[in-house]
Amino acid sequence: VKWFQLDADAPDDPKIRAVVYALGVEGFGGLVGLWCHIAKHGRRPGQGIDSRGAPFPLDDLVAATGLPASKFNELVEICTRSGHFRRDVWQMYRGVWIPAMERRADRYSRKLASSSQLPIDWAGQP
């Protein structure tokens, strides 16, 4: 999946506000970078797992945020505490699973299927 939904009201979400409060806009940027990485490389929407079903390497997740490791760890703590990331998946596998991203992708896919629409390819590729 190479897309995800980002609403204009995202900064007002309490889970996102907690990130901004603790880490500032740098933390928000890191979170968006992580969302992009998971959307682009994840096997399933919202799940930071590769094509074999293995969690992404921790170094790749840290690099995707652009944050130093200490701030990445703080970001993960905030997101698992708030429920933005599934805590159980992080604790067991050091994997990132974002339920909201998964739900939104499912809704979008159902909407496309029911209306027989396909995503627009802005690159002009068939």
Question: Where do the language-model regions lie?
Answer:
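Winged-helix/helix-turn-helix nucleic-acid-interaction surface
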Residues: 1-6, 10, 55-126
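Short recognition helix of helix-turn-helix/winged-helix DNA-binding domains
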Residues: 1-45
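Alpha-helix N-cap/helix-initiation sites
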Residues: 24-28, 51, 69-73
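A Lys/Arg-rich helix-loop hairpin that forms a DNA/phosphate-binding surface
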Residues: 43-55
